């Protein structure tokens, strides 16, 4: 009891190491490419870097410059370290998450000690999730426009879903377990 979060974080660890992450989705619909300021001791260390009008910033791989993360035509990077106009360093938020969860402390062996689920089974379940999400994707040839005004020629569905009910949230660390489940999705 109470070790569900460790199990879920181990799945995330395995998927990151297997490079089974839907980066296109993360770039399109999340703050994964938004730059996070890395300036130890500064008031805004750990906050999103923003432009003059409050827009979130990213590193555009096309222009090799800092850009508004919301603009159509921008190709945001999700990993790397970049220099802001004021000379400070920033990294995409996905980079911070990947750095944390790729650590061996979140691996299958570490989770097996806390959960009672073998490392072999954790890896197998992660592989099954990856297979369902990437090898059995559903593609609909339907044109649509996303939230940023970018035209899409197809819709991709990944047949993996989870729903956290009261059981998880009833535990003292339930909020963090639910958060981990949503990161996994």
Question: For the regions a protein language model found, what residue spans apply to each?
Answer:
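Long, well-ordered, tryptophan-enriched scaffold segments
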Residues: 1-144
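A glycine-rich, hydrophobic/aromatic-adjacent loop/helix-cap motif
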Residues: 103, 109, 125-185
């Amino acid at each position: 009891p109470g070790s569900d979060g460790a199990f879920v974080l181990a799945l995330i660890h395995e998927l990151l190491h297997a490079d089974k992450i839907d980066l296109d989705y993360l770039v399109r619909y999340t703050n994964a490419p938004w730059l996070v300021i890395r300036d130890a001791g500064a008031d805004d260390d750990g906050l999103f870097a923003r432009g003059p009008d409050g827009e979130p910033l990213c590193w555009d791989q096309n222009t090799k410059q800092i850009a508004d993360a919301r603009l159509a035509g921008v190709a945001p990077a999700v990993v790397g370290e970049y220099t802001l106009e004021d000379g400070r360093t920033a990294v995409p938020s996905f980079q911070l998450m990947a750095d944390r969860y790729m650590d061996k402390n979140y691996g299958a062996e570490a989770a097996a000690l806390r959960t009672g689920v073998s490392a072999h089974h954790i890896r197998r379940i992660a592989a099954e999730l990856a297979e369902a999400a990437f090898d059995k994707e559903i593609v609909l040839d339907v044109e649509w426009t996303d939230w940023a005004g970018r035209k899409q020629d197809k819709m991709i569905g990944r047949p993996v879903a989870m729903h956290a009910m009261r059981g998880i949230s009833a535990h003292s660390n339930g909020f963090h377990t639910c958060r981990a489940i949503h990161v996994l999705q």
